[in-house]
Amino acid sequence: LARRRFLQGALATGLLPLPSAKAAASPRIATLDYGLANTLLSLGVTPIAVAAAEGWSDWVVEPPLPSEVVDLGVDREINLELLAALSPDLILTTPYVQSLRSRLEEIAPVLSFSVYNENKRPFRQAQEATLRLAERLGREAEGRALLDRAETLFAALSVRLHVSDPGPLLLVRFMDARHVRVYGGGSLFQDVMDRLGLRNAWEGPATLWGFETVGVEQLAPAAGPETEIFTFEPVPQEVLPTLGNSPLWRRLPAVEAGNF
């Protein structure tokens, strides 16, 4: 159990912000992306508004989103009137909401960041985005310090993982009781695993975003008895009560071995 918790923490290293820089006077920034909001907080900047802020405690958890941050609503259906009323100096987005860009530009300048592309190196893209955002905010030193702390942490975790020598990992998110999203090449998780010397059991196809949605039974070739399966929260409410009775799930060798 202790090793499992350590592995979970190691995987989260590339996804969660490190300790934030000291807050200082900053522009009023709204963001339509959790990752960009995380980066702002790590740079010592609290956004004035975030899309889907209500779901932050389920999908992000740490760090907690300050209570004063305004919820703009679901990312593709954000409350544009509310956003305009907040008078932001800058709006941060991703290509995922490109269809809104022209309307957003009527409110404030827009800065868009892309982490997932054909290069399939999202961690490197995230590093570059961090430095680009830090430069825009006049926080270059904070941006470089953030990346330096991350590299130091990766190095320390790699040493510990080399000693424990964990087996292959299978990273999944349940979509419903019969289907999962499994993460492979091109995902941020894969980049983190590569840096830590961890092995991904999934060698199947993956989308541009580094995952593939498959039936539970399709996990079997990757879910050998030596594989540990990690599931990400939140798990749909209807899944947990039925999972123990699912023959598709219970017959996976990794599940039979108790590696779940």
Where are these regions (language model features)?
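N-terminal secretory signal peptides and thylakoid transit peptides that target proteins
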Residues: 1-14
